């Protein structure tokens, strides 16, 4: 179960202690458990939503979104901010884009992107709360983290060294394919058209990454996760 605990420590703000520095092979295997971490997040959000029944819808949605952000420690929002700054500031140049992405400072494009994404997610949750949200809360966190597995399975990692390279090089590819198949079938059962929307957004974002960078980075993977979560909740709110 060590790979699961590695995944949970990396993807969440939950207090997880590991017995020393994990080997690269275990780090790679941890990717297989990313969807399980997403499912855990979804279950916690579902439980929170159940406990918040009777709360005014705007407050209910705001508290759900706050819990959502706290569970991940805003890790992927940071990747989204860095990617937004780099994508517009890079002017189509690969090296400039990668250089800006490493800058820890956030520019106005990053701030605007974060505000818009969180605002849209809040509004979508507000709609879903009004409709009596249930098991659908499992979908977005699960799809977002399964997408990271799919991204590392089929996309080159362009930054040498670090966690991302270990994930890409030591991922058990056949097992990853089976995990993704199970995730897709489960999500199609729960979400229908919103899952197909997420698949389309995934394909589009991956195309943009490969065209600009020749692959992915940790920041663009985080941005992908955030935008797919948004696509799913928007699709559900729109009745897809």
UniProtKB/Swiss-Prot annotation:
GO terms for cellular component: plasma membrane. Keywords: Cell inner membrane, Cell membrane, Cobalamin biosynthesis, Magnesium, Membrane, Transferase, Transmembrane, Transmembrane helix. It is a multi-pass membrane protein. GO terms for biological process: cobalamin biosynthetic process. Pathway: Cofactor biosynthesis; adenosylcobalamin biosynthesis; adenosylcobalamin from cob(II)yrinate a,c-diamide: step 7/7. GO terms for molecular function: adenosylcobinamide-GDP ribazoletransferase activity; cobalamin 5'-phosphate synthase activity. Its EC number is 2.7.8.26. The keyword Isomerase does not apply. This is Adenosylcobinamide-GDP ribazoletransferase. Joins adenosylcobinamide-GDP and alpha-ribazole to generate adenosylcobalamin (Ado-cobalamin). Also synthesizes adenosylcobalamin 5'-phosphate from adenosylcobinamide-GDP and alpha-ribazole 5'-phosphate. It catalyses: alpha-ribazole + adenosylcob(III)inamide-GDP = adenosylcob(III)alamin + GMP + H(+); alpha-ribazole 5'-phosphate + adenosylcob(III)inamide-GDP = adenosylcob(III)alamin 5'-phosphate + GMP + H(+). The chain crosses the membrane at residues 31-51, 62-81, 109-129, 133-153, 179-199. HAMAP family: CobS. It is found in: Cell inner membrane. Its main location: membrane. The keyword Cell inner membrane applies. InterPro entries: CobS. Disulfide bonds: none annotated. Its cofactor is Mg(2+). Pfam families: CobS (PF02654). Coiled coil: none annotated. Belongs to the CobS family. It comes from the Bacteria. It comes from Pseudomonas putida (strain ATCC 700007 / DSM 6899 / JCM 31910 / BCRC 17059 / LMG 24140 / F1).
